[in-house]
Design a protein with these regions (language model features):
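Aromatic- and glycine-enriched glycan-recognition loops and surfaces
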Residues: 3-92, 121-128, 170-177
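Active-site neighborhood of glycoside hydrolase catalytic domains
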Residues: 53-60, 64-70, 92-192
Length: 192
């Protein structure tokens, strides 16, 4: 968070060097590294579009992972895969993937909505985000898995009307399913 959303590859490389010189063990790339159509330059857009920002990181995440490795420190990445901004490609494609009650306005908190992990398609998407990020950048050693808002307006566009009371159970089971899949494939990657 030393740079908030205002950084580029050169700035981050300098921070990695400084961190290594001070004896740090890990560099964590926080929020703002992703999204292109709606760049993540503030907290109002891009959340959910988990492709590295080509303007900020023209050589991709792998470049920074390698810079960290060269300096002898581990590389960590910030993700908040359960959340989405309405101003994102993900929300444009899948507005029915969020938690909300039919026939009621959506309730934004921190400019974001919550993805409905009771939906297996959402579970696959969230796992896919993590899987793609880690498989394309095998030197990532740590995931900071953020979740910065509380659930309001709870309802599921996926669950039938009779099953709406099962949202919480389905959500937690869906989250645990994703975490189990990540842990099974990436045993050596720490998550918080």
């Amino acid at each position: 968070e030393a740079t908030y959303f205002d950084f580029n590859e050169e700035v981050l490389s300098g921070i990695i060097k400084d961190a290594a010189d001070m004896g740090f063990e890990l560099f964590l790339l926080d929020d703002g590294w992703f999204a292109n159509k709606y760049p993540r330059d503030n907290d109002k857009a891009g959340l959910g579009d988990w492709n590295y920002n080509k303007k900020k990181l023209p050589h991709g995440l792998g470049y920074l992972v390698n810079e960290s490795k060269k300096k002898g420190i581990k590389f960590g990445i910030w993700l908040e895969p359960e959340m989405v901004n309405p101003k994102s490609e993900l929300y444009e494609k899948h507005p029915d993937w969020v938690i909300g009650q039919p026939n009621r306005p959506l309730d934004l908190s921190r400019n974001q909505l919550i993805l409905d992990l009771s939906n297996p398609k959402v579970q696959d998407f969230v796992f896919g985000v993590i899987d793609k990020t880690l498989s394309e950048n095998p030197g990532i050693a740590y995931i900071k898995w953020d979740c910065n808002r509380f659930v309001t307006n709870s309802g599921s566009y996926f669950l039938s009307p009779e099953k709406q009371s099962h949202l919480w159970i389905g959500y937690v089971r869906g989250l645990f399913s994703v975490l189990d899949r990540v842990r099974a494939k990436y045993k050596d990657v720490s998550m918080m």
